[in-house]
Amino acid sequence: MMFKQYLQVTKPGIIFGNLISVIGGFLLASKGSIDYPLFIYTLVGVSLVVASGCVFNNYIDRDIDRKMERTKNRVLVKGLISPAVSLVYATLLGFAGFMLLWFGANPLACWLGVMGFVVYVGVYSLYMKRHSVYGTLIGSLSGAAPPVIGYCAVTGEFDSGAAILLAIFSLWQMPHSYAIAIFRFKDYQAANIPVLPVVKGISVAKNHITLYIIAFAVATLMLSLGGYAGYKYLVVAAAVSVWWLGMALRGYKVADDRIWARKLFGFSIIAITALSVMMSVDFMVPDSHTLLAAVW
């Protein structure tokens, strides 16, 4: 029973979602030549760091979690694990994760993990989430760290491919998160969390969602245009972007914003999973010249 509680407080669903993106970034950079020990070290290292961040987040959010229907039954809210024990647990998870990334992968991968962790726990959870409408934007940077860590674990450098991955996953986080805030509007309102739909209104949030999906679409295409992924990835990226944008535009005419937002959120998971899979398997380009160079 205790094992289940210690697992729940790490938010395993979030860990799993991040692992998919780590694999995408890692295999994209590997280009078919996979270093399996490095692969395992990277996956486990990132998992532990994400788990640590989630436990710290649960500790920090105890007060607001009590006010939200979705989170009122979390382990720390119900007192199933003491706050002091959760801090020790989170610290041990983080230390183990950073050590694995440093010694098993490379220092760059570890530092990227540290930066993502500090942004999520120190900047987003401790301050921005409670005090600024821009909290989601800041949080998106930490959410984009895992695929970049996976990529840089292989390359050992932060190149344009890593920058494109950072852009793709950061931009994806915005409509994904705003959709959650719309269909969980009352929860965020009750907890006094200043997310965009609550502060500026759902109509404004819809405009932001549309613009971010357009920016996301452009960023996804850059992986192929920059010579990092192939034509199959390009086709899938274009298809999911167009479909997601179409769903966003239909939001201006819907009768029930909550139902629409749930569908938009659901497809966001499908979209980012499809991209992660495609960049994993379609990493080859036709020749040494990039598609972007061919266009010019």
UniProtKB/Swiss-Prot annotation:
Pathway: Porphyrin-containing compound metabolism; heme O biosynthesis; heme O from protoheme: step 1/1. GO terms for molecular function: protoheme IX farnesyltransferase activity. Residues 1-9, 57-78, 127-197, 248-268 are cytoplasmic. It catalyses: heme b + (2E,6E)-farnesyl diphosphate + H2O = Fe(II)-heme o + diphosphate. The keyword Cell membrane applies. One of its GO terms (biological process) is heme O biosynthetic process. Residues 29-37, 98-107, 217-228, 288-296 are periplasmic. InterPro entries: Protohaem_IX_farnesylTrfase, UbiA_prenyltransferase, UbiA_prenylTrfase_CS, UbiA_sf. It is a multi-pass membrane protein. Gene3D superfamilies: UbiA prenyltransferase. The chain crosses the membrane at residues 10-28, 38-56, 79-97, 108-126, 198-216, 229-247, 269-287. GO terms for cellular component: plasma membrane. Belongs to the UbiA prenyltransferase family. Protoheme IX farnesyltransferase subfamily. HAMAP family: CyoE_CtaB. This is Protoheme IX farnesyltransferase.
